[in-house]
């Protein structure tokens, strides 16, 4: 905010200072080089991905791009900190050494921490040995089941959404378990042309499905 000051002459030859009402003058914000003010990992005013994309599309230089400049000063970075939402009842384990770590550290300083490398003792580790014995007993008592015969050319199942005929014949699924629209690693897949039709057809058993046809 700035004031325009005028010197108003009076009749006696003297001048008096006259201050006009305040006029807001827009002052452009100063951009600072990020490497000159930032010395830590935390950024108090991290630019958004949309702003970085816009600056990249506009081909901004390094002194105007938000990836290399910031409006924050060095004091903002030095005084930047983050706090948890309220005082936690139980401190996070990542903020300090845990109780187990404190006990192990005390035992290590006292020389009472024995190495575990030679082997696992049954007295010190009863839960591990008991789990091994229980698993061995469970595997021994489990019943056997017969695998399906691999000589059959067409396997038949009940209660599953599978093909009625071999894939080489139909080239299509009888039942589709994928929701529409579906997602892949690149985003949402395009909708087939008849997905939203009230009386859509899935094609015959001997025709290719719609998603195998090219998109126009």
UniProtKB/Swiss-Prot annotation:
Main location: cytoplasm
Keywords, sorted A to Z: Cell projection, Cilium, Cytoplasm, Cytoskeleton, Flagellum
Leader sequence residues: none
Tissue expression: Expressed in sperm.
Location within or outside the cell: Cytoplasm, Cytoskeleton, Flagellum axoneme
Presence of the UniProt keyword Cytoplasm in the record: yes
Pfam families registered for this protein in UniProt: SPMIP8 (PF22574)
PANTHER family in the record: TESTIS, PROSTATE AND PLACENTA-EXPRESSED PROTEIN (PTHR35348:SF1)
Functional note: Microtubule inner protein (MIP) part of the dynein-decorated doublet microtubules (DMTs) in flagellum axoneme. May serve to reinforce and thus stabilize the microtubule structure in the sperm flagella.
Quaternary structure note: Microtubule inner protein component of sperm flagellar doublet microtubules.
Record protein name field: Sperm microtubule inner protein 8
Gene, per the UniProt record: SPMIP8
């Amino acid at each position: 905010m700035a004031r325009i000051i005028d010197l108003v002459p009076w009749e006696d030859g003297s001048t008096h200072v006259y201050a006009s009402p305040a006029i807001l003058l827009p002052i452009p914000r100063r951009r600072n080089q990020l490497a000159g003010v930032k010395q830590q990992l935390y950024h108090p005013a991290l630019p958004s991905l949309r702003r970085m994309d816009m600056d990249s599309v506009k081909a901004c230089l390094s002194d105007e791009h938000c990836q290399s400049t910031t409006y924050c000063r060095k004091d903002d970075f030095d005084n930047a900190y983050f706090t948890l939402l309220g005082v936690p009842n139980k401190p996070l384990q990542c903020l300090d050494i845990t109780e187990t770590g404190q006990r192990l550290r005390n035992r290590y300083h006292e020389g009472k921490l024995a190495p575990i490398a030679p082997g696992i003792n049954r007295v010190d580790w009863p839960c591990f040995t008991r789990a091994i014995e229980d698993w061995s007993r469970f595997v021994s008592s489990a019943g056997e089941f017969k695998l399906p015969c691999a000589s059959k050319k067409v396997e038949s199942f009940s209660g599953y959404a599978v093909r009625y005929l071999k894939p080489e014949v139909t080239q299509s699924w009888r039942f589709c378990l994928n929701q529409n629209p579906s997602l892949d690693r690149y985003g949402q897949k395009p909708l087939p042309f008849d997905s939203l039709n009230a009386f859509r057809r899935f094609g015959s058993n001997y025709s290719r499905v719609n998603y195998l046809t090219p998109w126009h």
